[in-house]
Amino acid sequence: IIEAGFPISSPGDFEAVSAISKSVKNSIPCGLARATKKDIDACHESLKFAKRFRIHTFISTSPVHMKHKLNMTNEQVLGAIKESVTYAKKFTDDVEWSCEDGTRTDLDFMYKTIELAIKCGATTINIPDTVGYSIPEEFAKTIKLIKNNVPNIDKAIISAHCHNDLGL
């Protein structure tokens, strides 16, 4: 998998993802998209040249991000997950979903979001430590809890996005 860029973010990123999707033969290019049709459409348009490609869609799930960044409730976020993963699935069978700011997300809500994303067709679930909040032992515990509390987790690959902001 080549995480090639965020196509909607700029013309340069769109062009770079398109160029990569046109040139790769044995790798799978991936584009990043917020949980909106416009972002997912841009991903598809930039990736459609590849034999196989992945769309990686995400939405914030932590209380602080949902309140101050998205101005959305839990129910609205769940609706956006359902809509975006289902929409991305129309373009490719390879859909990755991320719970942005996952390490600051309420665990019970995280389990619901992951279960829903998989139910809607996500084949990879990414757990990001968006703000570098978690130490390795805590992050490992979170992954174990996800494995033990998300009933359909066996239908997806677990992926991680970590930072070393603490210099550990």
Predicted segments, located by residue:
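Beta-alpha junction/loop-to-helix N-cap segments that form part of ligand/metal-binding clefts
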Residues: L32-T36
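Divalent metal-dependent hydrolysis catalytic cores, especially in the metallo-beta-lactamase
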Residues: I2-P7, C30
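Histidine-centered divalent metal-coordination motifs
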Residues: S159-H163
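Thiamine diphosphate
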Residues: N164-L168
